[in-house]
């Protein structure tokens, strides 16, 4: 039996006995053994599979450019990141901009503004729409990441990554959502149009905040795996699956305000299956990347 055949046989066996993901974890560990990490293969892996929790932060830091490709440099670079974090944090303390009572996600926002030259001296502090997006993402990232330094750098680079890499793609998400929802359930689209709700769905929550504050952090990290590794289209299929999952509830509502209000606060206890089905939908419509090793 060839090596590929053995791998396929083991994958099927593990899935049947309830150990789906064992082979995937082994594949990732092989990728992470190389001193020079292969970014393309890490991206492909992240597109195909959910990242194991024990490796997620490391992979995200590499894919978001917080850590370099060469692993031997990781300790030195991370020490530099830590020092930079402490310098910016201390600067905010010196100018009495933050205190021990300042909420952590607000500290992260002020640090980001100081680094990017946007820190305002006005009081109360002026909040722009993009700041609300930053805070929403920061709040969810804080639930995912224990270390403050890691958390800040991941928030900072995630926001920059989403704004720069997907600058053009973001403009198409609204249309793509309507297209794929219509393919899956045209009657549901017709109901949304008849209720004048289609143009008033919580698109900012979905496509700007990347579902931060909508899905539980434990579910959302599997969606963000796909974002970090290069696909913002996954957001479309999460939105589509939310509508499909709550079709009966949505079709029982007949005005835009009530539909929007419900979709902004969906029950968090059902978000894991929604994400799993959304990823399946994404693979169904967009294909599955070739195996990473």
UniProtKB/Swiss-Prot annotation:
GO terms under cellular component: cytoplasmic vesicle; cytosol; lysosomal membrane; TSC1-TSC2 complex
- What residues does the Rab-GAP TBC domain cover? 50-231
**Where in the cell?**
Lysosome membrane; Cytoplasmic vesicle; Cytoplasm, Cytosol
Reading the lineage from the top rank, the first entry is Eukaryota
**Entry keyword set:** Cytoplasm, Cytoplasmic vesicle, GTPase activation, Lysosome, Membrane
Q: InterPro entries, from UniProt?
A: Rab-GAP-TBC_dom, Rab-GAP_TBC_sf, TBC1D7, TBC1D7_dom2
GO terms, molecular function? GTPase activator activity
Give the matching Pfam families. Answer: RabGAP-TBC
GO biological-process terms attached to the record: activation of GTPase activity; cellular response to starvation; negative regulation of TOR signaling; negative regulation of TORC1 signaling; response to growth factor
Xref: Gene3D superfamilies: Ypt/Rab-GAP domain of gyp1p, domain 1, Ypt/Rab-GAP domain of gyp1p, domain 2, Ypt/Rab-GAP domain of gyp1p, domain 3
Give the PANTHER family listed for this entry.
Answer: TBC1 DOMAIN FAMILY MEMBER 7
Q: How does it assemble?
A: Component of the TSC-TBC complex (also named Rhebulator complex), composed of 2 molecules of TSC1, 2 molecules of TSC2 and 1 molecule of TBC1D7.
What biological function has been recorded for the protein in this entry?
Non-catalytic component of the TSC-TBC complex, a multiprotein complex that acts as a negative regulator of the canonical mTORC1 complex, an evolutionarily conserved central nutrient sensor that stimulates anabolic reactions and macromolecule biosynthesis to promote cellular biomass generation and growth. The TSC-TBC complex acts as a GTPase-activating protein (GAP) for the small GTPase RHEB, a direct activator of the protein kinase activity of mTORC1.
Q: Please report the name of this protein according to its UniProt entry.
A: TBC1 domain family member 7
